[in-house]
């Protein structure tokens, strides 16, 4: 074998360190990601959209339908005749729908005063930290209730407007830790 061929073979067979295979490329990518400011939003401030009989700060995500059957029982001291409150139970069947991640609507029917109801809940602010920092989540809630009971006294003027109730809430909540969240819900009922 001639010297130039031998030299060429040795050069081709000697492994070279390639920079493209440098393990620091992942580190460089991590540095780029850390350099970009990110926003972390608080999730699961509460586990559902309701707190007992009231609305929580939580919203359904876009396209989610949530059907709920809620019960309120009578008093336990009513005795065996009323089956300790079971006979006095009032029930509500409703469907809530997430139109967008910040807009939610719902319709329902309750056995209490034979009411039909509808509501809209809008997320105004969302708790976050990072690039966009917000200390709390704020939502607006508006609901309307329509009473369908028969009029008790048909001899007097019974106005349609007497059957309608409205409620407005400004729901403010903060998730302090995984185990503690606080919500305030100032309410106006008409």
Where are these regions (language model features)?
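Transmembrane beta-barrel domains of Gram-negative outer membranes and organellar outer membranes
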Residues: 21-157, 164-168, 176, 180-184, ...
């Amino acid at each position: 074998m001639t010297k130039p061929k031998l030299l060429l073979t040795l050069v081709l067979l000697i492994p070279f360190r390639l920079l493209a295979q440098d393990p620091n490329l992942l580190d460089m990518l991590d540095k780029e990601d850390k350099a970009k400011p990110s926003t972390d939003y608080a999730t699961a401030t509460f586990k559902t959209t309701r707190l007992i009989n009231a609305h929580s700060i939580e919203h359904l995500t876009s396209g989610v339908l949530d059907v709920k059957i809620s019960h309120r029982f009578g008093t336990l001291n009513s005795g065996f005749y009323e089956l300790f409150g079971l006979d006095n139970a009032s029930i509500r069947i409703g469907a809530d729908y997430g139109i967008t991640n910040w807009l939610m609507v719902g319709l329902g029917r309750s056995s209490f005063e034979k009411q039909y109801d509808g509501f809209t809940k809008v997320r105004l602010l969302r708790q976050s930290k990072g690039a966009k920092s917000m200390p709390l989540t704020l939502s607006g809630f508006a609901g309307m209730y329509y009473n369908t009971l028969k009029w008790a006294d048909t001899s007097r003027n019974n106005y349609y407007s007497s059957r309608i109730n409205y409620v407005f809430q400004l729901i403010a909540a903060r998730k302090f830790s995984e185990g503690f969240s606080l919500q305030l819900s100032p309410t106006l009922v008409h």
